[in-house]
């Protein structure tokens, strides 16, 4: 996951001077779309009996072969690190008359990494990223919620007709992620503040829908809530790399963003277990209340880092970055 976030964001940062937010959104939306498709395929391969070992083996074999066929040829033959490697400039970059375009003449604007690490808002950005990622971890537990709350009767016995749909909630969430990535990418290209509002509000509304729909077995509300909540997840995949470039520029973007991602993903690893402890202990109600609080804090902390970081950094013409 870390390699996916870092390499895609770093590559697109080099190729797009303008419209970076939109392109990030479209690119990461494909991961959500693929996840949704594979999730629906997987639930039918597994069937109602989720504990049968051979079906899991077949499923992972299918996923592995599909991933190899779809990714390796394009990685080997289609990807180039910099546009200058093939005699081009980044989309939206100005070209001067008589300019020689090559990787040897490449000089990107921005703050050096060592200087960025001394900025207080760099660490607030990490906190914001951690909150974004905690929100993104929530869908990992939605299938458990569905199987233990929605797909069982009053005595706790599984309902086969509902159990076979156990991947649908997470699938709807992944579709929401795909839509949200494009939406947030397009919005942040105009206003990063509006993108933060969009993602946080979607998180709150989505959790409320899943909470109500699951306990009351109202499947349309449940699945729609999953779709809406999926639009929170792009804050970590689409908004975080965009904010990083907005605050620190392109010069040492890869170095800075990689350092940001280390604690962000570390917190995500602990959050997966921590969220499980919440619903296994205090219960699912506490799980959803905490999630709503996280969604709200995503907006609050994200707004703080954008407001003060943008004021401090003017080397890359913030007005241009906001329109990029």
Give the predicted meaning of each segment.
Residues 80-110, 313-321:
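Flexible cytoplasmic inter-helical loops of multi-pass small-molecule transporters
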Residues 179-192, 279-280:
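Helix-to-loop junctions at the C-terminal end of transmembrane segments
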